[in-house]
Swiss-Prot record:
TM stretches of this protein: 743-763
Gene: bcsB
Membrane topology: Single-pass type I membrane protein
Pfam family, one: BcsB
Protein name: Cyclic di-GMP-binding protein
Topological domains, Periplasmic: 26-742
Positions on the Cytoplasmic side per record topology: 764-779
Pathway(s) the chain acts in: Glycan metabolism; bacterial cellulose biosynthesis
């Protein structure tokens, strides 16, 4: 018996030792220009490259339940690679990468990298190759063959799912050679172009996770998921004002976590959702699928399974009444760090300190200088390495009403370190703001220059040796990108075939110090309104107070699902801009209660009757009828100071149509000249659908400006029309300069008069002094 077992094991070992045909190391690549494929397509007899144990099926796949729900995802380089999506790998910059995530409640069971690339026709076949890494683990190698040179090539590379984690980086490394001896890595013939249609095919399988709030906000929001966070909100029926406020707090908190990903909050009335969702319920008013849930005696937050699908989770916000739901919502927004178990009871949420204007966590502080370390979003953001180091980017989110008109620049103290160039050459650091070049500085080759403090002048053109950097103020907006590019000349030895100089390229390292500072504390807050661009880019004026404590939202009585969705999406968007939930937002369904209030007003659904006849309203949508005022002159870009004559309403047109339309309008509050009204209007369910799509889409929001934004099937059209008013405060002398900014001739006349008056006063003063000196007896 032992001998039989011995021979069976020997045969098995011998068969597993046969080499596998690695057909996909150089995959089926039919060039788009008529050329033969580099390698025949994989057949079922040829196992895949990357197989952990040849001959063992599925050895590189994670062990998961066979009946779990799954989804197939295709991520193209156009979606996940740095802009523009394509990559050009060169001899001195051979690496390119893409990044993707995996949710905590999912696992990848299958992954395939599809590449479309074109190698340089000057490459040496086989010696040149493309290496594929996943999280720095080699997945495979694609040799460049003679048939592929200069032709578009299609290739597939299996990715081992066992190496996929919550955050993943696929790195492509180009190994290029164009001659056997005396190569120069900087040669322009060394390149490989990877097309933006390349991508990853992934199969995700959902896991049946435990109902445990210690992982909250997972699975309702997962930071590893780069998609828009779509989170349905379920109500028993049309919510009253208290429940609207509670749901708005929850939506704004999830918006603050979603950030750049975006957010969407579909609303369901007494319907069972088909995905992870938030459910609001009281003892007396609850959806039918919770009718058997025990009554509660306090605000409770509970995580339960979907009644029909254990892979879907519901977060139930339960209370005895709307007051309990409001307390539970504030518990989610401010006490979630204490969550654990299947449910928690929110005993108390007590405010200790009030919020201050302009203190939104996502905004650069304007009360003191801010260090670059405070602006980092990940650990290694302020450093870079390579023969050509990648650019270092810093995001600056500013209040839209920061008054920078007469500023000569924003002061920055910059401390940076870098690998010294071996010789004095033209290596430099370039500084850009919002893709506009500001200035460059040479990188010195002297030892004492490793730590530099510089100043970028705004008006003069010479270095003055001071320890500041100034940014031209008028180039700043609400969202800004400050970029530092370190450009090295990288001298590389060469030679001839008979006398070749070889060398090992050494990477350059650059660092912007965390202690570098930028100072916005010297500037006033002042802005001409209405300005829908400020609302679309930063949620202003509501976001002036991050907790929306000076905002009143006017809702229709018994709002429908679309109107509730507009409320939740809007406060979610504002939360994404500020990074803080709207815990002190006021919601009302009675338009008469806003009279005399010192607050900014957000209107959803329809203009209250008392405001419909306001002369400052420039558009109104009511059922199938709508009217709009158009300006004397519409300019594509706003001036530094708004021209009120151009904005004056020339005509008013009234139309009736059955087609869907929505609009966002802004005007001055009739109850306080320092307050604003923003109204989000629609004429039909389809109109609200377009309105919500515009609020959630950053690209569409970018087209909003002026006082009116009309949303139709064709897109968004904006107008600057109607009266201009000003929000904020300027000293009297700044107001004079601001008022004269659009009138240079008047400014010159006033300047001349001022000079004449000053000269006359000085002349009179000198006459008096001279008279007293010559006639002391007259004193």
């Amino acid at each position: 018996m032992k001998r039989k077992l011995f021979w069976i094991c020997a045969v098995a070992m011998g068969m597993s030792a046969f080499p596998s045909f690695m057909t996909q190391a150089t995959p089926a690549t039919q060039p788009l220009i008529n050329a033969e494929p580099a390698v025949a397509a994989q057949t079922e007899q040829n196992p895949q490259v990357g197989q952990v144990m040849p001959g063992v099926q599925g050895a590189d796949a994670p062990v998961v339940a066979q009946n779990g729900p799954s989804r197939d995802v295709k991520l193209t380089f156009a979606q996940i690679a740095p802009p523009p999506g394509s990559m050009v790998l060169r001899g001195i910059n051979p690496n390119g990468s893409i990044e993707f995530g995996m949710r905590s409640d999912e696992v990848v069971t299958k992954a395939m990298l599809n590449l479309e690339y074109t190698p340089s026709p000057s490459l040496l076949p086989v010696q040149s190759q493309l290496k594929v890494y996943l999280n720095d683990e080699l997945m495979g190698v694609l040799p460049v063959t003679k048939e592929q040179l200069g032709k578009k090539t299609l290739a597939q590379m299996p990715i081992n799912p066992l190496f996929i984690s919550d955050f993943n980086r696929v790195r492509l490394e180009f190994v290029g050679h164009y001659q056997d001896v005396c190569e120069k890595p900087a040669s322009t013939t060394l390149w490989l172009d990877v097309g933006r249609s390349s991508g990853l095919d992934l199969t995700y399988q959902t896991l049946n996770v435990k109902n445990d709030l210690s992982h909250f906000p997972v699975p309702f929001f997962d930071p590893s998921d780069n998609r828009t966070n779509t989170l349905p909100m379920v109500f028993a029926g049309a919510p009253d004002v208290g429940l609207q406020q509670a749901s708005a707090i929850v939506a704004s908190w999830f918006g603050s976590r979603s950030g750049w990903r975006g957010q969407n909050f579909p609303v369901l009335y007494n319907q069972l959702p088909d995905r992870n969702a938030i459910v609001f319920a009281t003892n007396d008013k609850r959806p039918d699928f919770l009718r058997d849930h025990p009554a509660v005696k306090a605000p409770v937050i509970e995580m339960i399974n979907h009644p029909q699908n254990p892979y879907v989770k519901l977060l139930v916000v339960f209370g005895r009444d709307d007051k309990d739901l409001l307390q539970a919502a504030k518990g989610i927004a401010q006490g979630n760090i204490l969550f654990r178990g299947e449910s928690v009871v929110v005993n108390e949420v007590k405010p200790l300190l009030p919020r201050k204007p302009y203190d939104a966590p996502n905004w650069v502080r304007t009360d003191r200088p801010v260090t670059f370390g405070e602006l980092k979003t990940y650990e290694e953001q302020l450093q870079s390495s390579g023969l050509e180091p990648a650019a270092i980017n810093v995001s600056l989110n500013l209040p839209p009403d920061l008054y920078l008109m007469r500023s000569t620049g924003i002061d920055m103290d910059i401390n940076y370190r870098y690998t010294m160039p071996p010789v004095k050459d033209s290596s430099r650091m370039d500084i850009s703001l919002n893709n506009q070049f500001l200035q460059s500085f040479n990188l010195s080759s002297k030892q004492e220059a490793n730590r530099l403090l510089l100043r970028i002048p705004v008006l003069q053109g010479l270095l003055d040796g001071k320890t500041d950097v100034s940014i031209p103020a008028l180039k700043l907006g609400a969202t800004n990108q400050l970029r530092f590019d370190f450009e090295y000349m990288n001298p590389m030895p060469g030679g001839s075939v008979d006398n070749c100089i070889t060398f090992q390229p050494v990477q350059n390292h650059v660092v912007i110090g965390d202690d570098s500072t930028i100072d916005f504390s010297k500037y006033y807050h002042f802005i001409p309104m209405p300005d829908l661009r400020a609302f679309a880019n930063a949620g202003f004026p509501f976001s002036r107070m991050a907790d929306l404590s000076q905002t009143i939202t006017v809702m229709p009585k018994a709002p429908n699902e679309a109107q509730m969705e507009t409320l939740l999406n809007t406060v979610g968007f504002i939360g994404a801009q500020t990074g803080f939930p709207a815990i002190n937002l006021t919601v009302t369904d009675d338009g008469s209660t806003i009279q005399g209030k010192d607050a900014d007003i957000m209107i959803i659904g329809g203009i209250p009757d008392k405001l419909k006849d306001d002369k400052q309203i420039d558009l109104l949508v009511q059922a199938t009828e709508s009217w709009v005022k158009t300006p004397m002159r519409q300019t594509p870009f706003p001036g530094i100071v708004p021209d009120e004559s151009d904005r004056a309403a020339e005509t008013r047109s009234t139309l009736t149509s059955s087609g869907a339309m929505a609009a966002v309008i802004g005007f001055q509050s009739p109850y306080n000249d320092q307050r604003s009204v923003i109204a989000l209007l629609a004429d039909s369910p389809r109109g609200y659908e377009m309105l919500n799509d515009a609020v959630n889409d950053s690209g569409k929001r970018a087209t909003m400006f002026g006082s009116v934004a009309v949303i139709r099937e064709s897109g968004i059209n904006s107008l600057r029309v109607g009266d201009v008013y000003y929000v904020g405060h300027l000293p009297w002398f700044e107001r004079v300069w601001y008022a004269l900014a659009n009138h240079p001739i008047l400014l010159a006349v006033l300047a001349a008069i001022s000079v004449i008056l000053l000269a006359w006063v000085l002349w009179r003063l000198l006459r008096i002094i001279s008279r007293r000196r010559l006639n002391p007896d007259n004193e």
